[in-house]
């Protein structure tokens, strides 16, 4: 398990990476980071929320498809419920919101 400061640094790097990937690829999303929350809004107003839950060292995604909790396991963020990869879930949510294929590369 990471220390709290390591978790915060890792999650901030991940949030920055997501924003950079969206900007570099020109996908139609607005990103806002405030506190522990990265809000990604599609052109039609659909939101995908990515946040960190520091006490449990989890990343959470909230999207139309549902809510997901991810814990770090061997260098990957995997869903606590079904072991789905963070990037798979995020890319599916972003693709559904934008109506085009979105592929955020792993950090």
UniProtKB/Swiss-Prot annotation:
GO terms classed as biological process: iron-sulfur cluster assembly
GO MF annotations in UniProt: ferric iron binding
PROSITE patterns, A to Z: FRATAXIN_1, FRATAXIN_2
Entry annotated with the keyword Cell membrane: no
Family annotation (InterPro entries): CyaY (IPR047584), Frataxin/CyaY (IPR002908), Frataxin/CyaY_sf (IPR036524), Frataxin_CS (IPR020895)
GO CC field: cytoplasm
HAMAP family for this protein: CyaY (MF_00142)
Function: Involved in iron-sulfur (Fe-S) cluster assembly. May act as a regulator of Fe-S biogenesis.
NCBIfam families to which the protein is assigned, alphabetical: FeS_CyaY (TIGR03421)
Protein name: Iron-sulfur cluster assembly protein CyaY
Upper lineage: Bacteria, Pseudomonadati, Pseudomonadota, Betaproteobacteria, Neisseriales
């Amino acid at each position: 398990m990471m220390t709290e400061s390591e978790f915060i640094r890792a999650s901030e790097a991940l949030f920055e990476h997501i924003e950079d990937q969206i900007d570099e690829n020109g996908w139609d999303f607005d990103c806002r980071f405030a506190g522990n929350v990265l809000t990604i809004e599609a052109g039609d107003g659909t939101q995908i929320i990515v946040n960190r839950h520091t006490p449990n060292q989890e990343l959470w995604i909230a999207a139309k498809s549902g809510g997901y909790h991810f814990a770090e396991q061997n260098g990957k963020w995997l869903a606590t419920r079904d072991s789905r990869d963070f990037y798979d879930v995020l890319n599916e949510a972003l693709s559904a919101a934008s109506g085009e294929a979105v592929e955020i590369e792993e950090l």
